[in-house]
Every structure is written in C-alpha cells, then in structure tokens.
C-alpha cells in the first residue's frame, strides 16, 4: 500500500470489556466493515492496548492502509475520535462479583435451573494470558474448603486449572483410578494462598500438550481438578474432552481465561467474573 495512517489513543482496556457481543465494542469494531468499502482503503485495524504491559508506549491504536491518502487518514481519525468519545462506556461483558458471591449464586442457580447448562465462573484475576501467574491457589482453596461443594454427592465441578509439577511427577507413577497426592500451585504467586497439598483419585492423564506439557485430572469427591506441569488456559471444549471431561454437562465450570470464546460462551447457563491476583482496574 502507498499510505499508512496510525493514531494512538491513550486508553487501556482489558479484553473482558471490549467484547463485540455488547456495546460499545460492537459498534466500534462494526465501523471497520462499513469503512473498509471506501475507495482506496485496503485494511483497518483497531488495537485496545495490552492492559497488562506496564510500558509508557502501551496504549490503544487505530491503523489504516491503502492507496487513497485522504480516505486512509480520514478513516483513521474518524475511528480514533469515536473510540475516544466512548472510552468511559465500556463495561464487563458479564456480571462481576466476589468469589464467595459467585459460589452462592452458583448453588442457587443449580437449585433453580431448568436445563443442564453449567454455571461458569471465570477467575479472570489468575488468567495466565492476561497478567496473572495462573498458579494462584486462593480460588481452589476456597472451593475445596466449601462444605456445600466438596462432598461426595456435591455438584459436579471442573476446575481448570492449576500448575503442580510435584503432583504431576507423582501422578505419572500412579495407575488410573488410584489415589495420588502432591503439592499444586503458588510456585510464582503465593501472596494470597500457599501451595495446596492435593489428594484425590487420578482420573485421566494426557501428555505432550504444547502449553501444559503434562495434564492430569484429580477427582476430589465431585470436584475435578485439572493439574498441569506448566500453566495453560482452557479455552475450548476439546481441551476438556481429551481429559475425559464434559464441560457441557458439568454443574459448575471454573476457568481462568477472562472472556469466553464462543463455544464456551454458548454452553453457559450463567456466567460471572471474579478476580483475585491481577486486577482489571486500570485507571
């Protein structure tokens, strides 16, 4: 292309606030499709900035390229000005609350629901793809200590996930169906909760994942804890199915990925965000 235009915007927004499912993100990104049809415009891009990168250069930007100088510059300025005008209108794509309230609402939902769709809690404060260490044990510790959740006939729960090289080492020397014990979590971030000595039944083992390296499922009563050798976000249904877990039919699904990709979003019965380690307060 002959021309490129770039406009910086002094804004930082987490992904949980810039979803195209809701306004104003829907209208902001919707401008691209409308304006790309202008003569001499090849491509338009909008970046919301990486809210977890503590660098002076970090900010939102609009970039356009094409062969028509006037249109390329005009479009860049138009979108950048619109972005700035709606900067205070961005909200979380789902309700946010404390973990304690999330658990209370999950239990209420399970008692009242009219379908088998899971209650999803996204622990965005420990999201390894957005500023979190991915190994904070605070949430898992609360769940394991909750008598309404951690019991033989309790709700079926999938917790994804917690790194635990110590437990992984022990699990790889254990047969499926046998009991295994080992420490998990708090290797990088123990500010909120120490490592947990996890004890349960080895349900499944998966080796060779490019992110996790090794994955195992440890069942504690009805709580299925995914333990990894290295931290890994669980975005897709296939991530669970290869571990013999069915997120569509579980009662409560806890993930650490912030906003949900469409296939997880579509199976939710209810969705809440909670936060502990890495806060989404960027102002």
Where are these regions (language model features)?
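Short gly/pro/ser/thr-enriched loop/turn and capping motifs at secondary-structure boundaries
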Residues: 1, 166, 261-262
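A charged, well-structured terminal subsegment
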Residues: 2-6
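Hard-cation-handling environments
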Residues: 13-221, 226
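Acidic side chains
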Residues: 123-126, 135, 251, 259, ...
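Conserved protein kinase catalytic core
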Residues: 129, 262, 282
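A C-terminal functional module that forms or caps the active site or interfaces directly
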Residues: 224, 229-272
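Single conserved hydrophobic/aromatic residue that forms the stacking wall/gate
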Residues: 273, 277-282
């Amino acid at each position: 292309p002959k021309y490129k235009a770039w406009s910086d915007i002094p804004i930082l927004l987490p992904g949980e606030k810039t979803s195209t499912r809701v306004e104003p993100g829907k209208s902001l990104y919707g401008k691209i499709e409308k304006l790309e049809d202008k003569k001499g415009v090849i491509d338009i891009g909008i970046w919301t900035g990486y809210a977890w990168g503590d660098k002076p250069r970090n900010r939102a930007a609009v970039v356009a390229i094409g062969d028509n100088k006037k249109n390329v510059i005009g479009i860049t300025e138009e979108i950048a000005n619109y972005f700035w005008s709606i900067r205070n209108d961005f909200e979380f794509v789902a309700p946010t609350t404390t973990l304690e309230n999330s658990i209370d609402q999950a239990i209420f939902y399970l008692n009242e629901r009219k379908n088998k769709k899971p209650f999803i809690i996204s622990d965005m404060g420990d999201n390894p793809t957005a500023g979190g260490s991915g190994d904070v044990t605070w949430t898992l510790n609360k769940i394991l200590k909750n008598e309404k959740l951690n019991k033989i006939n309790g709700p079926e729960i999938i917790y994804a996930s917690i790194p635990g090289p110590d437990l992984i080492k022990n699990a790889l020397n254990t047969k499926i169906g046998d009991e295994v014990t080992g420490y998990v979590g708090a290797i990088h971030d123990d500010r909120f909760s120490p490592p947990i000595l996890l004890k349960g039944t080895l349900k499944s083992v998966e080796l060779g994942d490019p992110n996790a390296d090794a994955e195992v499922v440890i069942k504690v009563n009805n709580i299925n804890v995914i333990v990894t050798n290295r931290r890994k976000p669980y975005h897709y249904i296939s991530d669970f199915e290869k571990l013999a877990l069915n997120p569509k039919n579980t009662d409560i699904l806890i993930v650490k990925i912030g906003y949900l990709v469409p296939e997880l979003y579509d199976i939710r019965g209810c969705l809440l965000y909670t936060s502990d380690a890495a806060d989404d307060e960027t102002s």
